[in-house]
Each structure stands twice: as structure tokens, then as C-alpha cells.
Amino acid sequence: MSEHQGRVIVITGGETGIGRAAVLRLAAEGAIMVIGGILEEEGAATVKAVRDSGGRAEFHRTDVRKTDQVDALVDGAVRDHGRIDGLICSAAVFDGFASGIDTTDALWDHILDVNARGTFLACRAALRHMVPAGRGRIVNVASIGGLVGMADGASYTASKHAVVGLTKHLGCFYAKEGVTVNAICPGAIETNVRANSQRLLGADAPPMAGVGADPDWVKRAVPMQRKGQPDEMTGIISFLLGEGASYVTGQCFTADGGWTAK
């Protein structure tokens, strides 16, 4: 039996990309997955995939920028299932590699609101239950853009640095309460993040250009000479949610094919 059997795990942004891959893996390992996101069609498809495989999952439309909606997602999971064992913050939008000069006020606000504020709101909502319970695992999906300065655009880089900083603070501050907070920092992963970000950003969306528009950039930047797949991120996430990571907190785990090791 998997150690995640019967555990209640809330995830934001679990309908696509790395989040979806995490949902599918953890549900297969027996976790009850409570998904919050705003892409309803993709959310429904993810829930169906889990249930068709015999797992348990549910989707709740949640805008992570909205305190009341995030609180409702987490509080609802506790109300319906009796507890929350884990939280994964995966909701994010991308800035299309927009430079500082090319970053509008609206783009900056939108990226920071989703990526940084959204992560904070979900962590806070979960901690309100985890701290009194004396246990809990939080995994934030950051990025190598939160560790270095030239992997992404200005607003995305700033937002992911914020996620890394928040992870370190919360991981240290709540360690004595039995709650661990860690992050995964993926590199270039094969997802629909650009198309989804254009949909989510709407009028605030910039051209999705930059380094990613060059088909050969991966060979130059990544020692493995390929992009990663979403399911290659899920092993670290599963580990950080488990008992094997009981002495790990405030840490950021890089999975980037060697990009930042050069």
C-alpha cells in the first residue's frame, strides 16, 4: 500500500501540465485529490481520467488571486474529508519572456497576483489547518526562474523568486509545528503553458516569443538536450509529500536536465 493511500491533498493548477501529472500520480498512489483551478474543461477531463482509473478526485473552480475562493477550496476539503494532509501550489501563468521594458503594469500585476499571491494565499489557508493538527506537507512549484536571472521574463522571474523566498520562510517558521514546506524548481518542461497563459492573461498577454521561439535553444542550454516531461517532476513532489522527507523543509529541488549546473 502506498504511503499516500487515503491522504487528502489539495492542489492548485492541477488541471494541466505539471499539476495534472501530479494529480494522476498521487491519485494512482491512493491520495484523494482536491483540485482548484479555472480551466474547467481541463479540470473535468483530469477528474475523469482519475476516476476512470479507480482513483478519487474532484475539481472546484478557483481563482487563486481571490482569497475567498482559495479559502473555500481548502476549508471545503477539510469539511468534506476531515483533514488536509498535503498542499501543492502549481497554479501559474507565464510572461512570454517579456523583458523589463516590455513588461506592462497590467502584465506585472497579473503574473505576480497568480504566481506569488496565489501561492501565498493557498499556503496560508492550508497552514491554518495544518498548524493546529501538528502535521502537514506543502510543495510549491517554483522554477529555475526563481533561482537565476536569465531563464525567463521580468515578471515571471520576480514571481518565482518570491515563491522560493516564501518557501524558505514558511519552511523555517513552521518547522517546529510539524509542517514542512518545500519547492520544486523545474527547468524547461513540455507543457501547454504558453497557450494556456495567453488564454488566462487575455488582454494582458504579451507575445510568447523570446528564447523559447528558437527551436535549437534546448540543445544549447540544457545538457540533456531535451525538455523534461511533466511526469518527470512528480517523483520529487511525491517524495516531498511523504514520510521520507520528514527532515526536509525550506528546500528547493531543481529538476532541469542540468541547465543550472553548467
Feature locations, PLM:
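Alpha-helical segment proximal to the catalytic Tyr-Lys
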Residues: 128, 172-176, 246
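Active-site helix of classical SDR
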Residues: 123, 159, 167
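Residue(s) in the substrate-gating loop at a strand-loop-helix junction
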Residues: 143
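Conserved glycine-rich cofactor-binding loop
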Residues: 13-16, 39
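Short, small/polar-rich loop/turn modules that mediate ligand/substrate recognition or access, typified
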Residues: 88, 175, 180, 248-250
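Substrate-binding pocket helix/loop in short-chain dehydrogenase/reductase
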Residues: 98-100, 104-112, 138, 218
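C-terminal substrate-recognition "lid" of short-chain dehydrogenase/reductases
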Residues: 3, 120-123, 131, 135, ...
